[in-house]
Curated annotation (Swiss-Prot):
Mg(2+) binds at residue 104. The lineage of its organism: Bacteria, Pseudomonadati, Pseudomonadota, Gammaproteobacteria, Enterobacterales. This is ATP-dependent 6-phosphofructokinase. The active site is at 128 (proton acceptor). NCBIfam families: PFKA_ATP, PRK03202.1.
Length: 320
C-alpha cells in the first residue's frame, strides 16, 4: 500500500514541468498520500536533498516555466552502486514510489530503478517530442510557439534584405519540432535527421526557387546535423545570395507554458497517481489520439519505435 511518493524533474527543462509537478502533488494529496519533492533530479536523489510538498508548495506554479525543483545532468547514475544509494535514500524517507518527469535519459534512470525493484512512473517532459509511447511531450507545444515566433521575426528581416536565413531548431535526433515549425512558419525548406541530407541538393532547391523569382528564403534545420555557419557560407557562395544562420538555442526551453502543455501536464500528473494507486509501477505515461495511455517503461525504451511524420514532410514540401 503506497503512502508516500517522491517526484523529481531530470534532464533538460521544459515548459510545463511545474504544471506536471503540481498535478502529481495535488492529485496525491487528494488521495491522502504524502509527497516529497526531490531537488535537482537524480543528483539530488543520490545526495538525499528532498523537501515535503503540500498544496501551497505548488500554488502559482501552473503558469511558470522551468522547474522549481531544479534539474541536473548526473551520468554517474548509470552506476548500480550509485542507484543503490538513491534507493536507500528513498526507503529511509519512507517513499514507496517515484514519479520522474523528463526525457529519454530520465526514463533510462527510471527504467534502471525499476529493474532494481523500485516502482517508478515516467512522465514525458521535453521540448524535443522524441519520447516513445506518446504523441506529444510536455513542453513541445510551448517550444513550437517560441520557434514559430522567431521564424516570423526572421522572415521580416530576411524579406527586407532579400536574404536566406537558416534557423537551427532543437530536437536532438528527432525532427518533430523542426518540421512542425517549418509548416507553421511557412519555411521554404526543412532539413530533419530522419531524412538523408545533402547540402548540394538543398542548394539546388534554393537555386530553383530563385529561378522562379523567390527573393528570400528560410531554411529550418534540426540541431546536430551540420555546422549551420558553414552551411550558410556554402549556400552564399553557391547562390550568390547573402545567407545568415541563427541558432535559437536554450530560448526554446523557456517561457510560460501554453494552455495545451498545462492541460497535458496536469492530466499526466494526475494519471500517474491513478496508476500508482492501482498497483502499477515501472510504467511511462503518454497521450495517444488524445487518450491517456501507459506502457511498460522497459519495453518502451528497448522495443517501441517512434513513427516519423512523413506525411508532414510531404505537406511541407508541397508548400515550398
Amino acid at each position: 500500500m503506497i503512502k508516500k511518493i517522491g517526484v523529481l524533474t531530470s534532464g533538460g527543462d521544459a515548459p510545463g514541468m511545474n504544471a506536471a509537478i503540481r498535478g502529481v502533488v495535488r492529485a496525491a494529496l487528494t488521495e491522502g498520500l504524502e509527497v516529497m519533492g526531490i531537488y535537482d533530479g537524480y543528483l539530488g536523489l543520490y545526495e538525499d536533498r528532498m523537501v515535503q510538498l503540500d498544496r501551497y508548495s505548488v500554488s502559482d506554479m501552473i503558469n511558470r516555466g522551468g522547474t522549481f525543483l531544479g534539474s541536473a545532468r548526473f551520468p554517474e547514475f548509470r552506476d548500480e552502486n550509485v542507484r543503490a544509494v538513491a534507493i536507500e535514500n528513498l526507503k529511509k524517507r519512507g517513499i514507496d514510489a517515484l514519479v520522474v518527469i523528463g526525457g529519454d535519459g530520465s526514463y533510462m534512470g527510471a527504467k534502471r530503478l525499476t529493474e532494481m525493484g523500485f516502482p517508478c512512473i515516467g512522465l514525458p517532459g521535453t521540448i524535443d517530442n522524441d519520447i516513445k509511447g506518446t504523441d506529444y511531450t510536455i513542453g513541445y507545444f510551448t517550444a513550437l510557439g517560441t520557434v514559430v515566433e522567431a521564424i516570423d521575426r526572421l522572415r521580416d528581416t530576411s524579406s527586407s534584405h532579400q536574404r536566406i536565413s537558416i534557423v537551427e531548431v532543437m530536437g536532438r535526433y528527432c525532427g518533430d519540432l523542426t518540421l512542425a515549425a517549418a509548416i507553421a512558419g511557412g519555411c521554404e525548406f526543412v532539413v530533419v535527421p530522419e531524412v538523408e541530407f545533402s547540402r548540394d541538393d538543398l542548394v539546388a532547391e534554393i537555386k530553383a526557387g530563385i529561378a522562379k523569382g523567390k527573393k528570400h528564403a528560410i531554411v529550418a534545420i534540426t540541431e546536430h546535423m551540420c555546422d549551420v555557419d558553414e552551411l550558410a557560407h556554402y549556400i552564399e557562395k553557391e547562390t550568390g545570395r547573402e545567407t545568415r544562420a541563427t541558432v535559437l538555442g536554450h530560448i526554446q526551453r523557456g517561457g510560460s507554458p501554453v494552455p495545451y502543455d498545462r492541460i497535458l501536464a496536469s492530466r499526466m500528473g494526475s494519471y500517474a497517481i491513478e496508476l500508482l494507486l492501482e498497483g502499477f509501477g515501472g510504467r511511462c505515461v503518454g497521450i495517444q489520439n488524445e487518450q491517456l495511455v501507459h506502457h511498460d517503461i522497459i519495453d518502451a525504451i528497448e522495443n517501441m519505435k517512434r513513427p516519423f511524420k512523413g506525411d508532414w514532410l510531404d505537406c511541407a514540401k508541397k508548400l515550398y
